[in-house]
Amino acid sequence: MTDPVLVANGLVRRFGDLTAVDDVSFRIEPGETYGLLGPNGAGKTTIISMVAGLLGPDAGETRILGKAIGPGVVSAKAHIGLVPQELAIYPDLTGRENLRFFGRLQKLGGDQLKRRIDEVLTVIGLEDRGGDLTKEYSGGMKRRLNIGIGLLHQPELLILDEPTVGVDPQSRNSILKSVEALAVSGMAVLYTTHYMEEAERLCDRIGILDHGVMQAEGTRDELLVLTGETDRVHLEGTGNLEAATTALRRLGAVKSVTGDRRNIERSGCDCPCGG
């Protein structure tokens, strides 16, 4: 049996009197896209900071390929590509020059780096725009280049922190297509979002977070099963279903709960796609 790429076990993180993350556990298998779904303030960014080794937990641990992760553990971090919400690109460099710069920071060079830049530009759909200055890029193109930087060193796990924030619907769709291409390539991805339809589209399994607690976890079919023309969904899976329902309401993804089986009527899409 193949070992998981990532195991997070009992993560707790406090900031003063605030418990931002409270006993969160999950794992990511090879080739799996795992989504952390929750409203702003749910604890998503704190979790990925711990997973990436930027922030130490107050309790619990994370392991990638069996190696413990934490601040200062360089060997484990080499397996992770972190793509934060903030853009890490230089506007007066071309897309290709940005990738070359960050590749050299990661100790890549020569023909290996050139080949890898070509591969990354193809994966993110910018093979025809790699020679353009990034200040001429659209918001979505900049986001995709940001993803490309995280891919350069061929990590076993790519972490994407809300990569579609602040972009128009067309750009957003292009970003999602790039993430789908990563899934086809077999890369493991940890994807955070507060858009439920993004999680449904991209993720093999989804963890629903609210107030730092994992309220429910499961596959798309386990968590949200569409029931045809009634435009209703059925919430299943493990965890506190009532709390998960509350979290989904806060996301604007549901508007009513009826019956013992907790059938949930979907509201209109809350994402920027206009749905």
Region locations from a protein language model:
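Short, solvent-exposed coil/turn segments
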Residues: 1, 21, 119, 228-230, ...
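Generic marker of residues within folded, mature protein domains
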Residues: 1, 137, 223-227
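ABC transporter nucleotide-binding domains
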Residues: 3-8, 13-216
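ABC transporter nucleotide-binding domain
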Residues: 176-267
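Low-complexity basic/metal-binding stretches
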Residues: 268-275
